[in-house]
């Protein structure tokens, strides 16, 4: 007999269901209340469960970003939005999640965007960051 234990990593809220996921998006169990699992990453969006692994692999390299995340949303079955606990929405482009998070991490340090009160950061155009003004990256 072989027993495999799945390690809970995220809570996926989709439509009216709340499901605990492992890092590969495997549905561990349905739950009624997400509040009892507030240590897990909260995830929204159609097919977020199928795309979680690549996102988590990248995010694990950026603990300073991870600790700020209140929840993430998979948009249009192709890209992620990060929602920070401070009320900031960060729009990521499709693909290359690691590179984009590296760029975001650097921008947050260089420009102090959160501390300056920016509530929306758009990284969907490569080499640019826009909030209420546009910043050109050095890439």
Give the positions of each predicted feature.
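Charged, solvent-exposed interaction patches on well-folded alpha/beta domains
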Residues: 1-139
């Amino acid at each position: 007999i072989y027993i495999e234990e799945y390690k809970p990593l995220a809570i996926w809220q989709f439509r009216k269901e709340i499901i605990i996921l492992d890092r590969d998006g495997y549905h561990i169990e349905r739950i009624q209340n997400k509040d009892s699992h507030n240590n897990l990453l909260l995830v929204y969006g159609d097919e977020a469960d199928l795309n979680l692994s690549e996102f988590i692999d990248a995010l694990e390299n950026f603990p300073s970003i991870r600790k700020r995340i209140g929840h993430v949303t998979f948009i249009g079955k192709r890209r992620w939005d990060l929602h920070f606990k401070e009320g900031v929405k960060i729009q990521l482009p499709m693909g290359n999640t690691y590179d984009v998070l590296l760029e975001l991490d650097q921008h947050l340090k260089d420009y102090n965007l959160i501390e300056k009160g920016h509530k929306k950061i758009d990284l969907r155009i490569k080499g640019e960051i826009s909030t209420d003004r546009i910043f050109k990256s050095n890439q």
